[in-house]
Curated annotation (Swiss-Prot):
The gene is tada2b. Transcriptional coactivator. CDD domains: SANT, ZZ_ADA2. A zinc finger (ZZ-type) spans 4-59. Zn(2+) 2 binds at C23, C26, H45, H49. PANTHER family: TRANSCRIPTIONAL ADAPTER 2-BETA, TRANSCRIPTIONAL ADAPTOR 2 ADA2 -RELATED. Its main location: nucleus. GO terms for biological process: chromatin remodeling; regulation of transcription by RNA polymerase II. Zn(2+) 1 binds at C9, C12, C32, C35. The keyword Zinc applies. This is Transcriptional adapter 2-beta. Keywords: Metal-binding, Nucleus, Transcription, Transcription regulation, Zinc, Zinc-finger. Residues 303-333 are annotated as: Disordered.
Length: 420
């Protein structure tokens, strides 16, 4: 009894269940590939009629000489499986092809037909050129990956390390900043059937985790660069033994405040070196201006500058004494006294001649001058004895008056030049 599930060629009665060509103009005309290629005609069917290829998926690609009887459908599943699971994962590939194929059969068929067969010989060249270039440096060289720069050691005892939870050899803490950051990616997995939205979501999680790691490392670097760990444990006493730093000028303080947003891109040492170099630059500029002044006055040797400065101070002293003598001579000649505005005020008789000139030029009453003088000398003596004091000058004394009085007291020898 004929099998109704099979199809036969109407011309040669060959079995065409796996592959046949059906005429689109004639009814029930199906030919095998041999009869179709020979141009067979039967009944009203002609060779130029349109046709349709009917594939049952059960014909073989490699012909009758192929072992195992692999159908075209199985070949397609095999190629899909090796693309999905990768070469060598024969168990998953066999499960994808079907239960009728074992992992050994899948491996042997793929190696025989696709690698060692004609298809493999045509696609895979006999000699594959080496496209990998070794760029690693020689061992022990200046850029060798085996060389590592050790981190500066921290002066911490075992008890301090346990208290802080710090591991110096690893430069890690038992409790890191943002300790729960790893929970973002701990449950992530890459699946073959993920759509684009799921892939982008997982990439966003990874990007968030990387940013958290960078912030964690930034905070650790700040703690090390600025020596915050010993300061936290009270181990910064050695810093007090270091020589005192130079006095920072007002202009440098303002510049430090302006550049504060840039501190995060530099280490503490780099910042201090930068400002130290700027201070040296200002000192060099001042020295250059001084040397240019000497050159304009005809001085070309360093040892001559001391004599020039001494002579200049003598000239200024003689000029000041001459002005005082002229003022006294004018008063003796009956001219209007320059002290007429203050000579009748209280405390005038307590002032020296130079102090009278100063008060007259500053339009300052003798009592106010004596008050300011007393406060300044008192603060100076307390500072020399190591007693902390805060100067409380009167409100009527502005910066110009204060500077003039300080300079006068310094030149007169009441206070040292450092105090002014």
């Amino acid at each position: 009894m004929a099998d109704l599930s099979k199809k036969y060629c109407v011309y040669c009665l060959a079995d065409v269940t796996s592959l046949r060509l059906r005429c689109t103009e004639c009814q029930d005309i199906e030919l095998c590939t041999d009869c179709f290629s020979a141009g067979a005609e039967i009944g009203n069917h002609r060779r130029w009629h349109g046709y349709q290829l009917v594939d049952g998926g059960r014909f073989t690609l490699w012909g009758p000489e192929a072992e195992g009887g692999w159908t075209s459908r199985e070949e397609q599943l095999l190629l899909d499986a090796i693309e999905q699971f990768g070469f060598g994962n024969w168990e998953d590939m066999a499960a994808h092809v079907g239960a009728s194929r074992t992992p050994t059969e899948v491996m042997e068929h793929y190696v025989t037909m696709y690698i060692h067969g004609n298809l493999g010989k045509a696609c895979i060249p006999d000699s594959i050129p080496n496209r990998v270039t070794d760029h690693t440096c020689p061992t022990g060289g200046p850029l060798s990956p085996s060389l590592t720069t050790p981190l500066p050691t921290l002066d911490l005892t075992v008890a301090d390390q346990q208290q802080l939870g710090y591991m110096p050899l690893r430069d890690d803490y038992e409790i890191e900043f943002d300790q729960e950051a790893e929970t973002l990616i701990s449950g992530l997995s890459v699946n073959y059937d993920d759509d684009d939205v799921e892939v982008e979501l997982k990439e966003a999680y990874v990007d968030m985790y990387v940013r958290k790691l960078k912030e964690r490392q930034r905070r650790k670097s700040l703690a090390r660069d600025y020596n915050l760990v010993p300061a936290f444990l009270g181990k910064d006493k050695k810093e007090k033994e270091k020589p005192a730093k130079r006095k920072i000028s007002k202009e440098e303080k303002e510049l430090r405040l302006k550049l504060r947003p840039l501190y995060q891109f530099m280490s503490n040492k780099e910042i201090e070196d930068c400002f130290e170099n700027m201070h040296k630059e200002r000192m060099l500029r001042a020295k250059i201006r001084e040397l240019q002044r000497y050159r304009r006055n005809g001085i070309t040797k360093t040892e001559e500058s001391a004599e020039y400065e001494a002579a200049r101070h003598k000239r200024e002293k003689r000029k000041e004494n001459k002005n005082i003598a002229n003022s006294k001579r004018g008063r003796e000649d009956g001219k209007e006294s320059e002290f007429a505005a203050i000579e009748n005020l209280a405390g005038f008789e307590l002032l020296s001649d130079r102090e009278k000139v100063l008060c007259s030029s500053l339009n300052l009453s003798p009592t106010r001058y004596l008050t300011v003088k007393t406060i300044i000398i008192k603060d100076h003596l307390q500072k020399r004895q190591g007693i902390p004091s805060k100067s409380r000058l009167p409100s009527y004394l502005d910066k110009v008056l204060k500077k003039r009085i300080l300079n006068f007291l310094t030149e007169s020898g009441w206070i040292s030049r450092d105090a002014s």
